[in-house]
């Protein structure tokens, strides 16, 4: 029986290779052509380039827009700016390195840069993830009024922005200190938490379960509960005003928005959660590394589609962006449903 060569400390390839020196396949030293043809790497490079350009542009524009237009700086818009900062974090620290590495077909920047890139991209991704949960919670708090006549003020908005960063640091720091680690993932051209190696030295299984519970199940449960309560509240309001066409239209549009928001979250994080759980439950089995690249790509792509869902579908933000970029002043309907859904401060104005 052929002896299986020992894996290198800084990377892991879950497929059999007819070679005793796995260091010769190091993703920090040589192109990873044994994992796929050059066309796949070039396609991924182009994809990451567009994600970088699109993600950086739309999120910088959101931040600049908020700075320029005072009416966008409401307390309940703080978290949307926080989401844009998190997306910008991923777009700047994750996508460019991946783009250049895919172009060279290996992680050309070395093991130390891999740890840094993995940490920063994970940090930004987790901040964005928790920001989506906070968006849902704040809307539930203001629209459903579970605390009665509650006024959402600056301290609440600031706390809502700080919480995602604390939660993200709690999730992204452990691999730097021995609980799991950051290594090349998928086609070995980008880095992230180690969720598929068989090395028990890093306790990867427990870290994966921690991420699944704390960074997927809890935020997703929060989003489903809060938006579910919001829909129930609006349905009751629509039932009470059955003769109002605008109320009925509002309920339909809110329902569509909620579905889009929940699907956006699932597209971003469900592949990571499901694939990592499959790896943990099928420890040591071979799998296609090209499939392992998909979750990373979808999470990085969220830097583009999350702003579209949460910012560009907001009439106030969209109008201000058009005015800033094109000089056009689009007339807003302040009573519109889109404003009620994405600019929730209009539902419960401050006293």
Curated annotation (Swiss-Prot):
Membrane topology per record: Multi-pass membrane protein
InterPro entries xref list: GPCR_opsins, GPCR_Rhodpsn, GPCR_Rhodpsn_7TM, Opsin, Opsin_blue, Retinal_BS
A Gene Ontology term for the protein's cellular component: membrane
The keyword Transmembrane helix belongs to this UniProt entry's keyword annotation: yes
Disulfide bond in keyword set: yes
GO molecular function: G protein-coupled receptor activity; photoreceptor activity
Annotated disulfide bonds: 114-191
The protein's name in its UniProt record: Blue-sensitive opsin
């Amino acid at each position: 029986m052929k002896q299986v060569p020992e894996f290198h400390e800084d990377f892991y390839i879950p497929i059999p290779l007819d070679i005793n020196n796995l260091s010769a396949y190091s993703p920090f030293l040589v192109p990873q052509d044994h994992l796929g043809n050059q066309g796949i790497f070039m396609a991924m490079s182009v994809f990451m380039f567009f994600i970088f350009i699109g993600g950086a542009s739309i999120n910088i524009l959101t931040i600049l827009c908020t700075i320029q237009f005072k009416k966008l700086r409401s307390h309940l818009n703080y978290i949307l700016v926080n989401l844009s900062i998190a997306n910008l974090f991923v777009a700047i620290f994750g996508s460019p390195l991946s783009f250049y590495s895919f172009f060279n077909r290996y992680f050309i920047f070395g093991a130390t840069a891999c740890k840094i890139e993995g940490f920063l991209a994970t940090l930004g991704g987790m901040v964005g993830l928790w920001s989506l949960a906070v968006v849902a919670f704040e809307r539930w708090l203001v629209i459903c009024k579970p605390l009665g006549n509650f006024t959402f003020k600056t301290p609440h908005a600031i706390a809502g922005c700080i919480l995602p960063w604390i939660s993200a640091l709690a999730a992204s720091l452990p691999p730097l200190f021995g609980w799991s680690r950051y290594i090349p993932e998928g086609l070995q051209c980008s880095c992230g938490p180690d969720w598929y190696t068989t090395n028990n030295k890093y306790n990867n299984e427990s870290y994966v379960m921690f991420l699944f519970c704390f960074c997927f199940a809890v935020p997703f449960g929060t989003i489903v509960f809060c938006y579910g309560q919001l829909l129930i509240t609006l349905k009751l309001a629509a039932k009470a005003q059955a003769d109002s066409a605008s109320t009925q239209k509002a309920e339909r549009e809110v329902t569509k928005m909620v579905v889009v928001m929940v699907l956006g979250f699932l597209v971003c994080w469900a592949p990571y959660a499901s694939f990592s759980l499959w790896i943990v439950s099928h420890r040591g089995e071979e799998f296609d590394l090209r499939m392992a690249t998909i979750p990373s790509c979808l999470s990085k792509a969220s830097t583009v589609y999350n702003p579209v869902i949460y910012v560009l579908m907001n009439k106030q933000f969209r109008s201000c962006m058009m005015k800033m970029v094109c000089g056009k002043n689009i007339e807003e309907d302040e009573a519109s449903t889109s404003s009620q859904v994405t600019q929730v401060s209009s539902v419960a104005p401050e006293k």
